[in-house]
Amino acid sequence: ALCALGTFAFSALDGTARMIRTTLNTYYEENNLADFWITLPTANRSALEKVAALPDVKEVCARASTDLDTTLPGDVSVSVTVYDGEMTINKPLLREGELLEANDPRGCLVEERFAQSKGLSLGDRLTVKLNGQQYPFTIRGIVVSPEYIVVTDGMAANPDQYGFILVNSCAIPELPLTQIVATMADGTQSDAVQAEIESVLPDALVVDRTAHMSTARANNDAQMFENMTLIFPVLAYAVAALIVMTTLSR
């Protein structure tokens, strides 16, 4: 019976683990998750062109990302990601409303769990503060994002106190672009492409998927479930073997 239980546990856990991994990879692919997050003092056109010119780089996009306080009740902050142009990399998955037009200076997209926690809906106002100045936004859409599967302020995910919003660069022109996100061509190796990027941008901090916090945590959770497919069946077989040995020794 224990051997049968072990076989059943392996089949069930293996099927679930494969489904989780396939779902995660499909989600990343369909929403064009970045392979690299490149942080530098200024993500100007020259830096963007240097990365785009690399033979193993497929797409690039300049943006900025920073934590800002809001005017919401309580000590609430958001990670504000500012895109220069269309959001072609790390494309948000729309839950409600509509995506931003590239020239929309007052619209924003809000992360779903944060919106639910704070009771935010389409058309509501959300105001962030930068250098003593307030920037009011109208919520155009409720979204989830492949790069924010795990939303955290560095310690723990808490949608009551922390979330993310997406806006266009024209919405906060005072915020300098300091990040480039990039995808690599099919069939290339991450380490090799990262070395190419670092060679043309020696002052940049280059992070790949294995070091990106949310992506790494999501992959670690999937890997942990895959490891469970081996542990529990082995335990069942080990207990069964122990029972047989004990019985025979008598």
Provide a role label for each language-model segment.
Residues 1-241, 245, 250:
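Membrane transport/envelope proteins' first extracytoplasmic loop
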